[in-house]
Amino acid sequence: MGLPEIIIEFKTKGVTAIKRSARGIVAIVLKDDTEEGQALNIYKSVLDVDPTHFTARNYEYLKLVYEGSPSKTIVLKVGTAVENLNPQLKQLNDLKWNYLVIPGITDDEKTTVSAWIKEARDDHHKTFKAVLPNCTADHEGIINLTTDNITSTLGTTAFTTAEYCCRIAGVLAGLSLARSCTYFELSDITAADVPEDADERIDNGELVIVFDGEKYKIGRGVNSLTSFTPEHGQEFSKIKIMEGVDLYQDDIRDTFESSYVGKVINDYDNKQAFVAAILAYHRELEGDVLDKTFNNTAAIDVE
């Protein structure tokens, strides 16, 4: 693909950014000894899932995810006696997805997954995120759900924090950048141990469920990041902001790798043309994704 088409592709990505942002993918690892079915499954709808391939509880987890309307799920089924999740994480490393959830996660596995997400984002520039229970990771890639004992119309018994992470992952994957998950109504909840100190918990990087007297809702849409730097300010603690950052990074990288590298001569003129394409992409993102009052620019580093 030549450079004129790259510009067209960037403009198209900009125009469709909001719509594409509502089509997130949830990866879910289920501990299940059911013999039927495969270890790796990709479903576009809960209607694609054969309930006989999973335990009744694991099937409820999938229903929780799909209540949030993700574009699809990547389901990895492992035995209940598995010693660690390293093989599954290696599989997921080569796939494209947005949010990871493991309803049967142990404390040791939580530590491993949190460290893996941090490494994937910080060292390998992946845009993976995970919804984990009671995980003070202090990182933008980890959403720390802390509300427990959640009674939902989607389950036969109350859900633990770890289990209800499935619902949150589905919500986050299905929301577009046109809105935040703050005060998103969770209409399936009929009871939950909501915190009395919600403001303090939110400031501590916790995603909490609140009750306004009539409805249960997500409190404020924050991730676990609480230590801020000049490079990673307080804005990076907002889930919606990070969704925009990740979408931007994926679009630039994917277009560069598929339409520039090996397709054109990497000389100064072509680099400038590619930068011009990025600037056109910026203009399409201003408003819902990029702050139109900010100088959103791109340039070649010649040093």
Where do the language-model regions lie?
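A general structural signal for short secondary-structure junctions and capping/turn motifs
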Residues: A17-K19, K90-L92, D199
